[in-house]
Structures are given as structure tokens and as C-alpha cells.
């Protein structure tokens, strides 16, 4: 056995063994050697977008999953660790436009390369279950379930105001609008009314909220979903009016509805604000060119609540009035740029005295501000020129200047106002949710075609929107399209567009919108269980699901996880599955960070520099005091920008392939597991990578030196162990017990620490004729080290396991039994305590493990250092710290 740690040949040999035996392909209902059914464990990382190359975030995510899967397999679980590709979406189209190739080719080429990278990492993936969401065999089931949802009324078509990117010619999700601009094009986003398909996720708001309670998810993620769903209880009521349309009918039956959680402030209403698209706004703008222009301005910008909360509040009076339901006073109606038609009724009541947004609006437009709640102690006083936080308080306040509601607390007033409005027939208590229905239509090519055929046109309605018959699924996306950036290329494909109406047989036109890619990622984890199933899912899904452990970034806390939970409940209601939640446990790994460096030109424009191209100038304490570009003869000033998330934009990423080529996959895996606990941020360190590599070389060299003696050693321990052997086993099994605990709580950084401690203990031991430790004892201890280290460092440990001969007696390492802690060996009959004289360490003493304070004192006083210090006299005091030390004050 070579003493050189040749990671290339070691990793190639291990991977050849695994691939040749197809060791990662798992089957349902697997049994152990005794024929007993194994418990299943489904551990899955969020599937990646095939962007072309893995980044270090991928490496960390998949290594966490792999460590978990390997360790649980050794514990006897039937473990599923699959992988797939979230293959549809805009990046492929953008790359296709840039490279003038079909998105399909770009995507499949990237998948092939990234699979090679994953293989190089040594991941225990069952590739027989691979799924690519751009494959018609996969997305046909998106289409099939869409049709089922259409039948049940869960999917529906409507026209709604959306974010429209005029450059990319597509609808943008709220999350794709940044500071009012399209995330990719940078164009000012417009508000447009566009017909599209929606999923009625709001009908599931309550179960989506209550279902969080039983999940083993981080509280932070649960809170984010709770806030996104946004349950609130309040009063929905109407302001009456007599504003008629062109036909003489009262608009919306003469009722302007609003929803409020602060019905106790109803007597302070001094205006109402409506969305730019509200029927009252449209009515008022018909004869008001200034208002019409303002409404058009409102249609540019985001439809996101968060953006609206921070943008400048603007409004314009419509000239219309509605009637206050309790005071019967006229209330002016304004158009506000902060009111969304898609939220609630598209109108809000304005109470400037007790809502900070309304307060600012009223000051700007000189609207009345009427105080209607006051602190119980009436101090401090209300000031209509300056906002104070207590104005919006619910606790410790009472109604004031509110007629029959004066003196009532918040809760009392809400109840009383609700009853008064209910008695008038224009209001009631209502539960409202912030959650909006999920719009899935995208004016994009590279996505799942929506299975709808349009029959007729404006002059001849025909059959309208007709679902594609199930027998005609999938509606296959032509994969040879090359987008040019001028909108959806499907609109130019007659071979895709032209079709006969399934109802009447007349010429018709396919829907060219495709589904939001979140549809693809909402159920892929179920398709892994039966990728070749003739139905959407089959009985294998019931075996593996719900998933035991899901792993992914915190950035997916809301949309992906929420949509996946919704999709699961839909499938349950359609009797496709029996479970209610998809992911029992969730681990959100921290981001990978690295140093950033940049240079600036005369205009202040930054050019971000890769850390590998920068040389640091360190002070005497090793702290950076400056930096320069390597090989730069122009002395370009380099600014140290601090530690930030690895990203293309900051040019501070580390190429995993380059890392594996230079150090090997085991070193990369060891570093990302050791550098930080999984949930915490990981700061990249070249020195840390070097340290991981040195540790693995130490492991290899130590085993290579003992291999020949260990191969012939017995697996049975001697019946009579000497003191050194007992102590060695106690130390190793103590560390094993801690490692087991750390594996259980997913603290893999301290698992690596445990392996390092074991090596430090074992490394000094050499098997020779004078060795105090016998070969069988060392063989047992080293087998524990290899098994503890194996999930993190599978290649090196796999080869050593074979070289030392463990495979002959215990089988391949990946299925070797997880080591059991020998509790008996942990029991100590004797312990060592530090001995101090007058607070200074003077040696140690051995005492019985169960010795009481008096016995410890006696043994300490009998020791040679104590006898010498006391010189026949008595001590002033003896201090015993149980289990640690004895201090004799002479």
C-alpha cells in the first residue's frame, strides 16, 4: 500500500467500485440480512437549475444531503437520495438569444456537464430516478393535473392587473420586480390587464397556515410563510353612493366596499382611496383628463405590496363622494397609487389620525385629520402635525370623539362597530388573507404549454377556451425554436398554433402561454419515487412520501415551499395521494461567503476582481492592510470590499471543479462540512482547504503504516485488556458517543472534529513487538474512525476499508454496520484530578471514580507534592472541585 495520498487514483477507484455495482439504486420495501423490512428514509436536496456549472452553494447543499444519506444507510435505513433538473425558465431563453441555439440544446448540454461534476463529488445519487422538468414525460402530468384543476374550478381564467416587462414582453412575478424594474431587462415595469390562468390557492389559505404547526421546519421559515399567507380578522363594510354608470345603474350596486382590521377607528375616516383600475376611478376619469393621465401613470410600476409601502404616496381627487355608513357625512374618493385592485376590493378607508400611511397622505394633500382614539391616561396629547407611534396602538387606548363608541377598548369597539354595520346590512366580521391566487400564465416559450385550445375570435366567439382532451396529452413543446427576444416564438409557429377545436372540429388556435416554472418544481420530488410510472404517481409514492428531510436555501422559504405544499393538498383532494404535507423536516443551509475586491475608474464604476487574482499586503499581526492585483504593473488601486455571498456579480466565486482537480472531492467535502454548522453561513478559506487536505494525508499515511499488521489482526477483542487498551477504548467510544449525537442533530462540523480527535489519539500508536496496544484493539478503534469519517469523506475511507481488510469481514463500507458505543467501557473506576498547591498546578492524582470529598482530600494530602509543601504541617484549606481538581492552601 503506497504511503502517498494520491487522491486522483483513490477517488477514481472508489467511484469505479460504486458505479460498477450500481450501489445507489434503491428499491421499495427493502429488507436487511435477516429478512426484516428496513425503515425508509427519503432525503432530498432542492433540484438545481441546469445553469452550466455547479457553484459552491450546490456543493455544500449536496454534501449535506450525501453525508446524511450515507450515515443513515449504515444505520440500516432504506435511503433514497435522487436528483433532477428544474430545466424550464427564462435563463435558458436568454442564453439561447445570446448564443443563437435552441434552449433545449443549451439545457441538455448543461445537464450532461453538471452530472459529471456531481459524479466527481462522489454523491450517492440514485440516477435511475433522474427527472428533467423539460421532458414531455414529466410535464404531461403538469398539463394533466391542470385539466383536473380546471374541472374542479381550482384553475380558472381571468383578466387581472399584472407586472408587464415591455422589453422581455412577459408577465413578471412580484419577486422579479426590483425597484420598479424588470430583474433581467431593467425596464420600467408597467401594470397591464392581461388574461391568464390562475390557481385558487387562496381557497387553501387556512390549511396552508394550520399545516405549518406540525412540521419540523425552522421557526424562521414558518414565520415567513405565516406572514406571506397573512391571516387577519376584521370587518368588511360598504360606503353607500349613488354614482351611476353610462346606463344609469349604480356602480357596484351603489356600494364601495373596504376591509379593515381597525374598525374601532371608523369614526375617523376622512377620505377613501381606490385603485387606478377601480370602476369609480374609471367613471371619474371619463371627463377629467388630468385624472386620466394620473391613472395612466399609476399603471407604470410594481404591483407588489412591499414596493408600494416604500414608494412615495401619490393621489388625486376624483370629485366623487361616498356616504359614511354611521355618520352619514360625505367622504371624498381619491385615486391612490398605493392601492391595488387585486387586493381585497381595490379600495381602502383613510383614517389619517391612526394610520401612518394615511397620515402622510393627508398632510401632503391637506385632508382632515380626526382623532378618534386616545391613550387611557390621556397623555401625551395628539398632535395632527407630527406622527407618533402611539396613534396606531391597539393596547392601552380607548375610543374618543366616536359618539356611541366612546370609552370602548379596541376589541370592544371592533365588535360594537361590526354589529352596528351588520344591523344596517352593509358589513360583517370577515377573515382576510394577504395571500393572492397564483397566476401561472407566462408569455414565454421555454415552459410547460398550457393545454388549452382557443376556438373563435372577437367576431365569432366559437367554443371559446377548450381544454385539450386527456388522450392528446402531452401538448409537446417544439424543441427547435431559437428565441430572438421579440416575444414568444410559439406565436410564429404555425405547426404548433394551428389545430382543430376538440368540440366543433373547426380551425382553432393553441394557447401559447406556458406555465410558471414553479409548477414544475411543485411536485418533482414525488415523480422521483416512480419516474417511469404510467400515471402521475403510483404506489411507490406512498412508500417514500412524505419526504423525511428536505434540504435547500432560505431563499425558497416562501414561494417554492408554499406552492409545493399547495400542490400536495390538491393531489390529496383528487385522491392521488393520502398524505397532507410533502416535507416533514426542512434544513436550510447557510450561504457560502468569500472576500470581495474591486477597483474603481474615474467615474466611480466598480470592477469586481476575483480573489485568486488579488494579493494581500498583511501587517505584523497578519491582518490585511492593503491589496494589489497579481502581475499588475500599473499599480491599480484595489479596494477590499468585505465578505459577501459568492456570486457572479461580485466575481468572488470558487469553481468547484478547479477545487476538486487541485485537492480532490474528499478535501472539498471535508472543508465545507467542517468550516461551519450546516444552517450557518460558511466563510471560504484557502487555509481551511489546505488544512482539510493535510488531515486526509495524515489519515492515509497512518493507515498505510499499519496496514500490513492490521490485515491479519482478529476482529475479536482479547478477553483480558490491559490498562492502556481499556483507556484507549474508553477514549474512542466516548468520542463515538459524541459523534453519534452530532450526526443525529446534523452538526457535521463537530462530527469532523470528533474524527480529528480520534486520529490524534490513535496516531501515536504503532503496532510492533513492544506495543502496549494489541492489533485487535487498534483494528476496532480504526474501524470506528473510518466509519465515523466515511459519510463526509467516502472515497478515502472506502479504499482504506478494503486495503486494511475490513471489507472481508464486515462487507463494503457503505453498508457496514454503524459502530455501537460500548457503554461498559465508558464507565471509569478511576479518574485523574489536577493537583494544585496554593493555586498553582503541581501535578495530578488518581482517585476512585466514586470517591467522596473526604476521600479525595485524604488522597491529595498523601501525595508527594502536598507532603513537600506542608512539611509535616496541616493545610489551611482544601478545595475540591468534583471531577476536575484539588487545591491545597498550605
From Swiss-Prot:
Disulfide bonds: none annotated. InterPro entries: aa-tRNA-synth_I_CS, aa-tRNA-synth_Ia, Leu-tRNA-ligase, Leu_tRNA-synth_edit, M/V/L/I-tRNA-synth_anticd-bd, Methionyl/Leucyl_tRNA_Synth, Rossmann-like_a/b/a_fold, tRNAsynth_Ia_anticodon-bd. GO terms for molecular function: aminoacyl-tRNA deacylase activity; ATP binding; leucine-tRNA ligase activity. One of its GO terms (biological process) is leucyl-tRNA aminoacylation. It holds the Pfam family tRNA-synt_1. Its main location: cytoplasm. A motif ('HIGH' region) lies at residues 48-58. It is found in: Cytoplasm. Keywords: Aminoacyl-tRNA synthetase, ATP-binding, Cytoplasm, Ligase, Nucleotide-binding, Protein biosynthesis. Gene3D superfamilies: 2.20.28.290, 3.10.20.590, HUPs, Isoleucyl-tRNA Synthetase, Domain 1, Valyl/Leucyl/Isoleucyl-tRNA synthetase, editing domain. It catalyses: tRNA(Leu) + L-leucine + ATP = L-leucyl-tRNA(Leu) + AMP + diphosphate. GO terms for cellular component: cytosol. A motif ('KMSKS' region) lies at residues 645-649. ATP binds at residue 648. Its EC number is 6.1.1.4. NCBIfam families: leuS_bact. HAMAP family: Leu_tRNA_synth_B. Belongs to the class-I aminoacyl-tRNA synthetase family. This is Leucine--tRNA ligase.
Amino acid at each position: 500500500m503506497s504511503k502517498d495520498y494520491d487522491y486522483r487514483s483513490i477517488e477514481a477507484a472508489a467511484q469505479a467500485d460504486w458505479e460498477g455495482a450500481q450501489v445507489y439504486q434503491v428499491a421499495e420495501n427493502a429488507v436487511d440480512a435477516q429478512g426484516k423490512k428496513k425503515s425508509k428514509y427519503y432525503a432530498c436536496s432542492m433540484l438545481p437549475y441546469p445553469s452550466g456549472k455547479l457553484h459552491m452553494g450546490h456543493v455544500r447543499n449536496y454534501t449535506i444531503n450525501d453525508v446524511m444519506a450515507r450515515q443513515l444507510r449504515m444505520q440500516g435505513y432504506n435511503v433514497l437520495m435522487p436528483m433532477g433538473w428544474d430545466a424550464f425558465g427564462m435563463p435558458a431563453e436568454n442564453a439561447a438569444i445570446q448564443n443563437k441555439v435552441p434552449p433545449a440544446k443549451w439545457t441538455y448540454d448543461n445537464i450532461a456537464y453538471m452530472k459529471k461534476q456531481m459524479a466527481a463529488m462522489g454523491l450517492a445519487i440514485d440516477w435511475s430516478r433522474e427527472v428533467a422538468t423539460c421532458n414531455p414525460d414529466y410535464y404531461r402530468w403538469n398539463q394533466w393535473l391542470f385539466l383536473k384543476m380546471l374541472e374542479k374550478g381550482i384553475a380558472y381564467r381571468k383578466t387581472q392587473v399584472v407586472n408587464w416587462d415591455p422589453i422581455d414582453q412577459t408577465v413578471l412575478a412580484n419577486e422579479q420586480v426590483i425597484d420598479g424594474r424588470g430583474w433581467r431587462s431593467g425596464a420600467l415595469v408597467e401594470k397591464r390587464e392581461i388574461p391568464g390562468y390562475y390557481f385558487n390557492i387562496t381557497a387553501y389559505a387556512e390549511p396552508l397556515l394550520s399545516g405549518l404547526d406540525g412540521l419540523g421546519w425552522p421557526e424562521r421559515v414558518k414565520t415567513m410563510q405565516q406572514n406571506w399567507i397573512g391571516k387577519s380578522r376584521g370587518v368588511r363594510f360598504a360606503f353607500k353612493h349613488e354614482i351611476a354608470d353610462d346606463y344609469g345603474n349604480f356602480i357596484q350596486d351603489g356600494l364601495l366596499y373596504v376591509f379593515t382590521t381597525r374598525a374601532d377607528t371608523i369614526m375617523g375616516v376622512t377620505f377613501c382611496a381606490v385603485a387606478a383600475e377601480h370602476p369609480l376611478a374609471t367613471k371619474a376619469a371619463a371627463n377629467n383628463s388630468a385624472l386620466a393621465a394620473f391613472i395612466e401613470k399609476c399603471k407604470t410600476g410594481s404591483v407588489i405590496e412591499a414596493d408600494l409601502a416604500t414608494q412615495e404616496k401619490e393621489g388625486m381627487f376624483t370629485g366623487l363622494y361616498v356616504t359614511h355608513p354611521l355618520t352619514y357625512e360625505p367622504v371624498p374618493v381619491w385615486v391612490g397609487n398605493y392601492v391595488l385592485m387585486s387586493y381585497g376590493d381595490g379600495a381602502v378607508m383613510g383614517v389619517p389620525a391612526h394610520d401612518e400611511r394615511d397620515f402622510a397622505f393627508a398632510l401632503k394633500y391637506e385632508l382632515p385629520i380626526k382623532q378618534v382614539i386616545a391613550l387611557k391616561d390621556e397623555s401625551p396629547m395628539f398632535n395632527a402635525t407630527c406622527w407618533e407611534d402611539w396613534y396606531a396602538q391597539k393596547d392601552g387606548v380607548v375610543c374618543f370623539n366616536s359618539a356611541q363608541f366612546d370609552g370602548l377598548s379596541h376589541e370592544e369597539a371592533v365588535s360594537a362597530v361590526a354589529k352596528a354595520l351588520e344591523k344596517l346590512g352593509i358589513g360583517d366580521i370577515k377573515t382576510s388573507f394577504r395571500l393572492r391566487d397564483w397566476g401561472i400564465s407566462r408569455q414565454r416559450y421555454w415552459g410547460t404549454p398550457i393545454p388549452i385550445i382557443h376556438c373563435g375570435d372577437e367576431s365569432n366567439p366559437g367554443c371559446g377556451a377548450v381544454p385539450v382532451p386527456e388522450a392528446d396529452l402531452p401538448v409537446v413543446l417544439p424543441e427547435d425554436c431559437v428565441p430572438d427576444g421579440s416575444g414568444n416564438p410559439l406565436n410564429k409557429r404555425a405547426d404548433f398554433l394551428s389545430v382543430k377545436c376538440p368540440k366543433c372540429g373547426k380551425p382553432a388556435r393553441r394557447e401559447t402561454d406556458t406555465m410558471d416554472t414553479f409548477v414544475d418544481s411543485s411536485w418533482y420530488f414525488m415523480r422521483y419515487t416512480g419516474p417511469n410510472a404510467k400515471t402521475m404517481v403510483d404506489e411507490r409514492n406512498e412508500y417514500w412520501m412524505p419526504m423525511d428531510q428536505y434540504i435547500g436555501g432560505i431563499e425558497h422559504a416562501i414561494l417554492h415551499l408554499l406552492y409545493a405544499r399547495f400542490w400536495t393538498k390538491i393531489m390529496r383532494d383528487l385522491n392521488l395521494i393520502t398524505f397532507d404535507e410533502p416535507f416533514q423536516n426542512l434544513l436550510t443551509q447557510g450561504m457560502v461567503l468569500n472576500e470581495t475586491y474591486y477597483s474603481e475608474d474615474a467615474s466611480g464604476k466598480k470592477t469586481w476582481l476575483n480573489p485568486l487574482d488579488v494579493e494581500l499586503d498583511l501587517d505584523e499581526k497578519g491582518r490585511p492592510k492593503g491589496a494589489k492585483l497579481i502581475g499588475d504593473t500599473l499599480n491599480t488601486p484595489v479596494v477590499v470590499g468585505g465578505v459577501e455571498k459568492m456570486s457572479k456579480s461580485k466575481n468572488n466565486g470558487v469553481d468547484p471543479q478547479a477545487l476538486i482537480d487541485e485537492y480532490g472531492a474528499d478535501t472539498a467535502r471535508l472543508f465545507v462540512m467542517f468550516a461551519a454548522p450546516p444552517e450557518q453561513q460558511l466563510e471560504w478559506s484557502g487555509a481551511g482547504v489546505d488544512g482539510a487536505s493535510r488531515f486526509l494525508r495524515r489519515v492515509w499515511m497512518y493507515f498505510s503504516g499499519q496496514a500490513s499488521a492490521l490485515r491479519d489482526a482478529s476482529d475479536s477483542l482479547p478477553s483480558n485488556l490491559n490498562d492502556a487498551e481499556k483507556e484507549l477504548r474508553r477514549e474512542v467510544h466516548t468520542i463515538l458517543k459524541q459523534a453519534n449525537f452530532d450526526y443525529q442533530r446534523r452538526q457535521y462540523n463537530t462530527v469532523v472534529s470528533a474524527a480529528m480527535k480520534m486520529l490524534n489519539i490513535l496516531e501515536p500508536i504503532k503496532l510492533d513487538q513492544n506495543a502496549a496496544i494489541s492489533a485487535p484493539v487498534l483494528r476496532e478503534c480504526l474501524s470506528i474512525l473510518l466509519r465515523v469519517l466515511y459519510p463526509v469523506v467516502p472515497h478515502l475511507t472506502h479504499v482504506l476499508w478494503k486495503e486494511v481488510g475490513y471489507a472481508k469481514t464486515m462487507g463494503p463500507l457503505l453498508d457496514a454496520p454503524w459502530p455501537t458505543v460500548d457503554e461498559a467501557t465508558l464507565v471509569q473506576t478511576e479518574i485523574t484530578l489536577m493537583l494544585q498547591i496554593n493555586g498553582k498546578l503541581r501535578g495530578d492524582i488518581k482517585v476512585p471514580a466514586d470517591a467522596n470529598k473526604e476521600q479525595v482530600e485524604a488522597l491529595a494530602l498523601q501525595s508527594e507534592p502536598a507532603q513537600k509543601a506542608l512539611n509535616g504541617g496541616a493545610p489551611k484549606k482544601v478545595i475540591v472541585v468534583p471531577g476536575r481538581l484539588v487545591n491545597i492552601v498550605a
